[in-house]
Amino acid sequence: MNGTRIEFEGITKVFDSGKKNITALDGVTLTVEPGEILGVIGYSGAGKSTLVRMINGLDTPTSGKLLLDGTDIVGMSEKKLRDIRAHIGMIFQQFNLFTSRTAAGNIEYPLKLAGVDKAERKRRVDELLAFVGLSDRGGNYPEELSGGQKQRVGIARALANNPALLLADEATSALDPETTHEVLELLRKVNRELGITIVVITHEMDVIRSIADKVAVMEAGKVVEYGSVYEVFSHPQTNVAKRFVSTSLRNTPDAIESEDLLAHEGRLFTITLSENSGFFTAAAKAKDAGASIGIVHGGITTLQKHSFGKVTVRLNGEKSVIDDFYAYLTTTTDIQEIQR
């Protein structure tokens, strides 16, 4: 199966609230390639959910084009939009399962609507229950399932009609961290084995870090940053992106930790480490010039097969040597001195 290609070209959405107009989307332009996982992140009111509603045709742009596999869906008739939606799966934060239907019954429902015959429905439901790891839960009702199991049913239902595109709107927000990890692993499996394009809407950078290929950071209806997860994590350009990255990495000392670190001699610097940060070159030069250097806080992780992290280092030595260390790294990476 090939995933859907999505192209936003100058998409703007203005809502008329009566007293004043509210711009929910402001000139959004970006492309999601077939089989890619795009993470869209932003705080409440950034325009994330409106963006999703544009993709499945539930909202119409005020201006701009929205192309799915090269076809502009803006202005399409409702009948044609229904045909488009038949190839789009949707996963919700609150699961949206029918309480009166079993897990199997919930998965079967969209197949019934599509007119699939009974034998094929059963085959497909059994196949999907196995795919999401719930073969023994088909006869259970939602109230008998955990939150993670309910979301697995939701994912299976979204896959029932073999979509080429999956939209996940805050799909893990109601789940605990361990269950969130399991659901994200399942979405990765969906993408890897079925080739489906996935758009993940979230306010959690850890979700982006875990699953996405690309990330679009939204603020006030605009995409303020867009690129690979590694690019945005290692070199965030806007304040909103920097805030999101800091919530995920948590490698910058807080005020209390900084106070403890400053109780010792030496100057402290918090440095972003990436493959081209130049840190090890600068550290070697400082050591050759007689300075001592040690990592006192932080750590390194892996993002999309790249090493990345933040560390706080303490330097002792001549002022000119430490000044040179700082000046060099200001040209290659993000470095901040912790002031006494």
Curated annotation (Swiss-Prot):
Catalytic activity line of the entry: L-methionine(out) + ATP + H2O = L-methionine(in) + ADP + phosphate + H(+); D-methionine(out) + ATP + H2O = D-methionine(in) + ADP + phosphate + H(+)
Transmembrane annotation, as ranges: none
UniProt cross-references to CDD domains, sorted A to Z: ABC_MetN_methionine_transporter (cd03258)
Entry's localization field: Cell membrane
Domain ABC transporter: 6-245
This protein's record includes keyword Heme: no
Membrane topology qualifier: Peripheral membrane protein
Matches recorded under InterPro entries: AAA+_ATPase, ABC_transporter-like_ATP-bd, ABC_transporter-like_CS, ACT-like_dom_sf, MetN_ABC, MetN_ABC_transporter-like, NIL_domain, P-loop_NTPase
Leading EC class: translocase
GO cellular component: plasma membrane
Keywords: Amino-acid transport, ATP-binding, Cell membrane, Membrane, Nucleotide-binding, Translocase, Transport
Keyword Nucleotide-binding: yes
Pfam families per the UniProt record, alphabetical: ABC_tran, NIL
Residues bound to ATP: G42, Y43, S44, G45, A46, G47, K48, S49
Molecular function, one GO term: ABC-type D-methionine transporter activity
Subunit description: The complex is composed of two ATP-binding proteins (MetN), two transmembrane proteins (MetI) and a solute-binding protein (MetQ).
Family label: Belongs to the ABC transporter superfamily. Methionine importer (TC 3.A.1.24) family.
Entry function: Part of the ABC transporter complex MetNIQ involved in methionine import. Responsible for energy coupling to the transport system.
PANTHER family in alphabetical order: AMINO ACID IMPORT ATP-BINDING PROTEIN, METHIONINE IMPORT ATP-BINDING PROTEIN METN
Listed name of the protein: Methionine import ATP-binding protein MetN
Organism (species): Corynebacterium diphtheriae (strain ATCC 700971 / NCTC 13129 / Biotype gravis)
Gene (UniProt): metN
